[in-house]
Amino acid sequence: MSDDVCINDRIKEIKENFNLKQSDIASITGYSVNSVKKWMMSETQQYYQKAPIQALKILDSWINTKASIDPVDNEDKKTADVLSFLNFKGGVGKTTIAFNISLMLSKTKKVLVIDCDPQGHLSSSLIKDPNDMEYSTSDLLMGRRGEPYSYSENLGVIGTDRTLSNTCESIPASDLLFLLKENIEKYKKQYDHIIIDSLPSKGPLYDAVLAASNKIIVPFTADLYDSWGLQDVFQQVKKIKLRKINENIKVAALIPNRVDKPLRNFDRTVLDSVQSSFPNEMCPDYISNSVRLKECKSPAVSMAITDYAPTDKVSDEYKKVLNFIINS
């Protein structure tokens, strides 16, 4: 690995550990936000830029100063970010991406997965025996006590079952709006990331997911109607912010999924159009169609694609997508 990649990776690590925005790094180091954005890119991306060693030295000095002033400050203020995977349209691979990103993150971070899709496909992939699920999304919304299912030392799961739809119908929409946000608060100091798999349709639970989230991740396919629906997501997020329901929410990443390679002309036109409309949110790396992705999430396997098929090209694609999400 080259020295510049090591420097860039270290700056990314500082950004994540101290929950800094790109604008924060620019303010601390004195470099422009545009420069910082290029440091956050992967080495293979077009506008990737080597971060100067001086920037890293300034950040290290900032960390030392911060620690000497308040050595327990970072631990006390540690709070998980909430990433929600959603799209109004089903069949875009939303759950598959949430599954893999959750497992990949849990290699080095503590992750809590919450299944808010009544279909429960993510729950089925992570909890092989439904009888092992002692605490569900319905329990969470109702404020009941319980412990998430332990998939591994670093990965907890709050799965869903058939009661979720009835539970949501029994709660007034105005109350449900904030219940998810309020009831996951206790987990924010226990985990580094909380990942929510949202249902693929609008409604009170969908709004509750938006109210609870920091980052919205939107998988989509190179389908004209699918791409048109992306604007709806941005409008919903804007509405949530304008109504002061959640001012800390943003659409962080649009992930092109199930892309046939080499790209067909029509697919390229659709993806170029999305890139033009949403240049900051559009992930430059695509996820290919692969039977391996169906295999790895089956309950009998339940492994991240990077473990199940580490040499497959789709594993490298997922690593790049994860990097984009974390640094968005």
Question: Which residues are covered by each model-predicted region?
Answer:
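P-loop NTP-binding core
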Residues: S2-V5, N34, K38, T44-S328
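A short, Lys/Arg-rich alpha-helix, primarily the initiator
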Residues: M1-F18
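Surface-exposed, Lys/Arg-rich phosphate-binding patches that contact polyanionic backbones
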Residues: E16, D24, K215
